[in-house]
UniProtKB/Swiss-Prot annotation:
Protein name: Cytochrome b
Keywords, sorted A to Z: Electron transport, Heme, Iron, Membrane, Metal-binding, Mitochondrion, Mitochondrion inner membrane, Respiratory chain, Transmembrane, Transmembrane helix, Transport, Ubiquinone
Residue sites binding heme b b566 per the record: H97, H196
Similarity remark: Belongs to the cytochrome b family.
Naturally occurring in which organism (per UniProt): Myotis levis
SUPFAM superfamilies on file: a domain/subunit of cytochrome bc1 complex (Ubiquinol-cytochrome c reductase) (SSF81648), Transmembrane di-heme cytochromes (SSF81342)
Length: 379
């Protein structure tokens, strides 16, 4: 009799994905973020489910229902701050995961990569809609500003914005539909994660050298299960430290003021994980141009596989490309900082320069440097 693990229709799928899966023997801790993202998604769905049991999506009561969760529900404050800071952990892991893919050439698995980019968009949309739900000042004005960007689309823009709002401003209808979508999207994301893994398991994992590791594979369990558990413990420690010691560190104090359409906050800004994109949006003086740059800042990931001109897959043995990669990282950190600053003299010009640098590195310099390195390797 064969083992149930290998014969049962459902269990054998789990077995071939998490137990007997052949994995390269040399994948580093940068390969931990996939499993951490899975845990983040599960945590967000779970805490979100319990929050939704006590939340009301009505403009009159939304803000008070969140206060009620924090004050009156048993451990409601833990749920709320786990959910809010869990989103931050989610994005930290996401950006590191994408950065790993760029550095080690994992984008050469185009199907896996493209689904990953769509997943990134979906998670960003979900996070944006979630930020609107507490109905504080930043929730309301963030929703107003970001949905208004769609009015830059020629001809249909204004109608589109009013259709999304369900009226002539962000109001009751908007909040209700955002709650509905915020609840629905994570389950769609979970389904897409399945497809992401399905495509990954067609090819197997990449590794730090970028050279096929077929000759040297080890079973996923116990080696990488224990390694993933270590990563999980570190992430949970960081998350709990944040939640229990300074839960509002990454939040905006303005969101503790109930939404007021008659009073605009002095500095409207999104959560920290969108600041780089917000800075790119603001650095272009034209509305439509800014919106295009905002979308392209993420969409550019789709064309990365097309711009791969190197004979080597990974950047491990390409010092010039490494310099560009870390310059890109520095430029994104700079944009994140500038996105949180007011629109004043030094920040505007620096933001424009960083934006141009980001696009230039990703779209032109990487491809040219790789071509140059091919000749260096020959010498």
């Amino acid at each position: 009799m064969t083992n149930i693990r290998k014969s049962h229709p459902l269990v054998k799928i789990i077995n071939s994905s998490f137990i007997d899966l052949p994995a390269p023997s040399n994948i580093s801790s940068w390969w931990n973020f996939g499993s951490l993202l899975g845990i983040c998604l599960a945590l967000q769905i779970l805490t979100g489910l319990f929050l939704a049991m006590h939340y009301t999506s009505d403009t009159a009561t939304a803000f008070n229902s969140v206060t009620h969760i924090c004050r009156d529900v048993n451990y409601g404050w833990v749920l709320r701050y786990l959910h809010a800071n869990g989103a931050s952990m989610f994005f930290i892991c996401l950006y590191l995961h994408v950065g790993r893919g760029l550095y080690y050439g994992s984008y050469m698995y185009t199907e896996t990569w493209n689904i990953g980019v769509i997943l990134l968009f979906a998670v960003m949309a979900t996070a944006f809609m979630g930020y609107v739900l507490p109905w504080g000042q930043m929730s309301f004005w963030g929703a107003t500003v970001i949905t208004n960007l769609l009015s830059a689309i020629p001809y249909i823009g204004t109608n589109l914005v009013e259709w999304i709002w369900g009226g002539f401003s962000v109001d009751k209808a908007t909040l209700t539909r955002f709650f509905a979508f915020h609840f629905l999207l994570p389950f769609i994301i979970a389904a897409m994660v399945m497809x992401h893994l399905l495509f990954l398991h067609e090819t197997g994992s990449n590794n730090p050298t970028g050279i096929p590791a077929n000759a040297d594979m080890i079973p996923f369990h116990p080696y990488y299960t224990i390694k993933d558990i270590l990563g999980l413990l570190l992430m949970i420690t960081a998350l709990l430290t944040l939640v229990l010691f300074s839960p509002d560190l990454l939040g905006d104090p303005d969101n503790y003021t109930p939404a007021n359409p008659l009073n605009t906050p002095p500095h409207i800004k999104p959560e920290w994980y969108f600041l780089f994109a917000y800075a790119i949006l603001r650095s272009i003086p034209n509305k439509l141009g800014g919106v295009l740059a905002l979308v392209l800042s993420i969409l550019i990931l789709i064309i990365v596989p097309l711009l791969h001109t190197s004979k080597q897959r990974s950047m491990t043995f390409r010092p010039l490309s490494q310099c560009l990669f870390w310059l890109l990282t520095a430029x994104l950190f700079t944009l994140t900082w500038i996105g949180g600053q007011p629109v004043e003299h030094p920040y505007v010009i620096x933001g424009q320069x960083a934006s141009i640098l980001c696009f230039x590195i990703x779209x032109x310099l990487m491809x040219l440097t790789s071509l140059m390195e091919n000749h260096l390797x020959x010498x």
